[in-house]
Structures are given as structure tokens and as C-alpha cells.
Amino acid sequence: MALVVLHYTGMRSAAAALARLTDPGAKVSAHYVIDRDGAALALVPEDRRAWHAGVAGWGAISDVNGHSIGIELVNPGHDWGYRPFPPAQIEALVALCLAIRARHGLPPRAVVGHSDVAPARKIDPGELFPWRLIAGHGLGVWPAAWTNAPPDMGAALEGLRAIGYRPDLPDTGPAKVIAAFQRHWRPGSIDGRLDPETMGLIAAVRGSSLVPCLYGAAPGAT
């Protein structure tokens, strides 16, 4: 196991999401679901494949379903009334992810979002997900500081690839990968454009991608 991929359910209710995730005909599943009150339910054993990522890639991993644990957070998503993730839900997520990290010997940077691994198709867990907060617990990374830099698309794509993004995925390209990066590290302004702030953040995240950085916040972050 190499990754933990975070999702939102994107359905009207927890019951509807659970029904879909346990329906063999739906051809979609996840290892865990965490309700808004923090109740966590295991659906698929960690040593078995769950069908949660779809066409996706991260670093050298092209078969994300076969190399990751998928966690679904109950949230209506952008189609049904996207809303902040409650503290109880995030506390349960942190506890679960720390246990998964310990069981599988995963580094902090192994915790990513669905939109990170599938930037052309997905936007979950979305701009309201508290990436900075969970990085403070050793789940994901957050740059301690950053400096605006002159935009350089070649250098930006090199940095994004070093972080793990895959511009080569079907129907993907620079703008979609940049938007996915912004959704994770600059959620207050997601436009897919390589501006000086985004350029500086790419360099900062790349430099901090092996250890969690617990202080400071990127623009618009929670």
C-alpha cells in the first residue's frame, strides 16, 4: 500500500452513499466511510482492492486502486450543497489515517485527495477540506513559508511532477493540474493559472514534500 486517497461521498445522504458503495452493480467501493458525526465504517479490508479512484495516477503509480486505501467522507459535495467538514468527522479521519500510516509504514506525503490523483475528473474532497489542519497531525504536507516567483511553466510542471501530479493522464494538462494543486494548497483562488503565488507555492510544497510542515498557511487555506 502506498497512498491514502481522501474523497467526499457527493450524495444527498449518508444512507444513499452507503447503499451505493455496497451495491455490487455500482462498481464503486471504498475501504472506509466516515459520517459527519465521526462514526467510521469499514467496508473493504485494507489488503483488498477497492474501486474508488477510477482513472488516476500519482508519481510512478498508475494503478491507484491497487496501491491505495480509499476513505469516503460523508458530504453532499458540490452537487447537493457542499459544506464544511465537522470537527468530529475530521478527528475521526485523523485517527484512522494515523493508524493506517502506522500499519503500512507510510510517509506523511502519502495522504492525498481524489482531485490530486484524478485532476481532470474530480474536485473532491474540495476547497473546504482542512488540508493544513491534518498536515499538523502528520497527514500530508504544508509549506512553512513561500515566496512568490516568476511564472515558468516548464519549471512548474517539473515541480508538480516531483510532488506527484500526472499531467499525462487522459484529458489532463497544465491548467487542470494547476487547478488541482491550487484546490489543495491555495483553495481561496482556484483558476488553473500559473501566477507568481502559485509558482512560489509549487516550489515550497516540492521542497517540503518529504516531511510535514506545521506552521504558516497558504492563501485562503483553512
What does each model-found stretch correspond to?
Residues 54-57, 87-105, 109, 119-222:
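Cell-envelope/ECM-targeting effectors and their regulatory/trafficking segments
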Residues 2-109:
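Active-site-adjacent loop/helix surface patches within enzyme catalytic domains
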